[in-house]
């Protein structure tokens, strides 16, 4: 029996390895190559798709491998399954774009335009962050190990960003912040 739940998860792992390799390549190049940054942004969106699937059903039968995958996704994407569980899995699939769904797409209007997109991202971002903090905090007393595990993912991401900023601030902005923000905004927008 394979450690992976599905053979197709090899594609996801290959994709994550390529995204990681692209980051390492760019970081080690002397200058910024815009086509590679654009590719990183596109791959950040794809990483979000993998994260979405991993939040619904983890890739591995083996818990330690799922933990490593969680940390890997956090480093590549900037958020983890901890943010998808309260906002998407436990909320969106429960309310399905009806009142109570924090991802309600027609909160302001049925029209598809830039203004509604900006409002959707701004309001959704506030709702998402609040839901994630409440979700993580809910484990503090009942399941402290889970609480610290979820918190460790956030801390790992911010330590990664902080170290990158200390080493090369411009590279941290272009190779970490830009693709991660693009990936999140593109995912929320689709």
Regions inferred by a protein language model and the residue ranges of each:
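Activation segment
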Residues: 58-59, 96
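Non-catalytic, topology-defining segments of multipass membrane proteins
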Residues: 1-46, 50, 67, 75-177
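Short, surface-exposed linear patches
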Residues: 71-72, 106-107, 185-187
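Alpha-helical transmembrane anchor segments
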Residues: 171-190
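Active-site His/Glu-centered metal-binding helix of metallohydrolases
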Residues: 54-55
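Post-HEXXH active-site segment of zinc metalloproteases
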Residues: 60-74
């Amino acid at each position: 029996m394979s450690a992976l739940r599905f053979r197709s998860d090899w594609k996801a792992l290959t994709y994550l390895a390529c995204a990681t390799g692209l980051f390492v390549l760019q970081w080690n190049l002397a200058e910024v190559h815009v086509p590679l940054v654009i590719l990183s942004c596109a791959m950040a969106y794809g990483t979000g798709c993998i994260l979405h699937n991993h939040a619904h059903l983890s890739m591995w039968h083996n818990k330690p491998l799922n933990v490593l995958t969680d940390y890997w996704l956090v480093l590549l994407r900037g958020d983890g399954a901890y943010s998808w569980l309260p906002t998407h899995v436990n909320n969106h699939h429960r309310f399905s774009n009806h009142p109570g769904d924090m991802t309600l797409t027609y909160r302001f209007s049925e029209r598809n335009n830039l203004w509604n997109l900006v409002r959707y991202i701004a309001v959704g971002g506030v709702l998402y962050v609040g839901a994630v903090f409440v979700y993580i905090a809910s484990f503090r007393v009942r399941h402290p190990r889970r609480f610290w595990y979820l918190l460790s993912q956030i801390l790992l991401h911010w330590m990664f960003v902080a170290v990158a900023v200390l080493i090369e601030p411009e590279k941290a902005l272009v190779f970490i912040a830009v693709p991660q923000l693009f990936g999140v905004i593109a995912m929320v927008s689709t």
